[in-house]
Amino acid sequence: MRRAAAAAVTVTTTTRMAAEGMSTAAAAAEATATAAPAAGSRWGRAWPSALRWIPTSTDRIIAAEKRLLSIVKTGYVQEQVNIGSSPPGSKVRWFRSSSDEPRFINTVTFDSEENAPTLVMVHGYGASQGFFFRNFDALASRFRVIAIDQLGWGGSSRPDFTCKSTEETEAWFIDSFEEWRKAKNLSNFILLGHSFGGYVAAKYALQHPEHVQHLILVGPAGFSSETEHSSEWLTKFRATWKGMLVNHLWESNFTPQRIVRGLGPWGPGLVQRYTSARFGSHSTGELLTEQESTLLTDYIYHTLAAKASGELCLKHIFSFGAFVRKPLLQSASDWKVPTTFIYGQQDWMNYQGAQQARKEMKVPCEIIRVPQGGHFVFIDNPSGFHSAVFHACRKFLSGDGEEGLSLPEGLTSA
């Protein structure tokens, strides 16, 4: 029975987290963008989309998502999960505000076999759940797959970002995810997070280990810290005019998405050039088809150009140079959930940080490297990525935990 499951260290590193190589463009156009009718405003909605400076809206995000997911053969249910407006004890300002406006988490749940283990997938910075479009069919054959847009990204609600500290910013993502879990009535699930989503997933598992059966971190942020050498380099760089400019942009919370908005109707062209380069000429693995490239480009544009919200976490989570302010390495000894790290062999995220964390962990931990894959290994080498996930979850898939103990061919252990 099937069910519809309802430099070395510079700001360049952060730009790669947001769009992994998106070209820099003049941000002066941002001033023009703010003067034009916003896509989400009442005045903006009255304009035909073709005449808006930023031609997007929440409806267009969801429409682009549906077009992208039309590639997926497995049936699914898309829903906006209401997470309320004021979870008790939250550290986030908007949760404590007088506004009773509910918040929603955009969620897609794929058809699965009865009693299949639940796999929850969390996207990275500047991305959304649709980035996993090449993985849903294969993973849904073994799991009950649920993918979400984190609060402030994709088709989820985009509240004004009022966080003023690292603690409050982490709570923005962790508390909203916990409210989503309650609304979905999930108790035991496998949690997979990519890049910044891996950071959020790990922080969530540290606070709520009772709900997470296994943690899969794909090229996660948060496992590197500022070394003495890089600190010296940054000090010297800040003293230059370029360093002062970059530092000013960082402290102003300038994000790559602002470039896309600032370009207005020319933004889609920039995104198209990025997609063609990252998943085409510069790809380390399986190239996108023409259809995939067109649909993914359209989807990425609408998710990046929409109202700034979750993206503004940047300076509170990362210090200048893209080092996390609260490295997960500091919490490795407190880990309570068995963990698997997955890295593409060409991933610019350093897997040595995971090796260092493993030494401190008191729970089972393995590190798998997938060939022909970069930071978006699940797009670059889908079959290799699926093999790594199935291997990581062999205990839940085989029933007795004894089958498939050897690493699948092509994968390597670090």
Swiss-Prot record:
Q: Which domain of life is it from?
A: Eukaryota
Question: What molecular function does GO assign, one term?
Answer: carboxylic ester hydrolase activity
Concerning InterPro entries, the annotation shows:
AB_hydrolase_1, AB_hydrolase_fold, Epox_hydrolase-like
| Catalysis performed (reactions) | a 1-acyl-sn-glycero-3-phosphate + an acyl-CoA = a 1,2-diacyl-sn-glycero-3-phosphate + CoA
- Keywords from the named record: Acyltransferase, Cytoplasm, Lipid biosynthesis, Lipid metabolism, Phospholipid biosynthesis, Phospholipid metabolism, Transferase
- Report the EC number(s), separated by commas if there are several: 2.3.1.51
Its GO CC terms? cytoplasm
Q: Which residues form the AB hydrolase-1 domain?
A: 117-382
Where does the UniProt annotation locate this protein? Cytoplasm
Protein's UniProt keywords contain rRNA processing:
no
**EC primary class:** transferase
Query: Has UniProt tagged this entry with the keyword Acyltransferase?
Result: yes
| SUPFAM superfamilies recorded | alpha/beta-Hydrolases
Q: Using the record, list the residue span of the signal peptide; answer none if the entry has no such feature.
A: none
Biological process (GO), any one? phosphatidic acid biosynthetic process
Motif range (GXSXG):
193-197
Q: Relate the protein's function as given in its record.
A: Lysophosphatidic acid acyltransferase which functions in phosphatidic acid biosynthesis. May regulate neutral lipid accumulation and participate in the regulation of lipid turnover in vegetative cells. May possess additional triacylglycerol lipase and phospholipase A2 activities in vitro.
The record's domain comment reads: The HXXXXD motif is essential for acyltransferase activity and may constitute the binding site for the phosphate moiety of the glycerol-3-phosphate.
Recorded family membership: Belongs to the peptidase S33 family. ABHD4/ABHD5 subfamily.
- Mind telling me what this protein is named? Probable 1-acylglycerol-3-phosphate O-acyltransferase
Q: Which organism is it from?
A: Oryza sativa subsp. japonica (Rice)
Traced from the root, the source organism's taxonomic lineage reads: Eukaryota, Viridiplantae, Streptophyta, Embryophyta, Tracheophyta
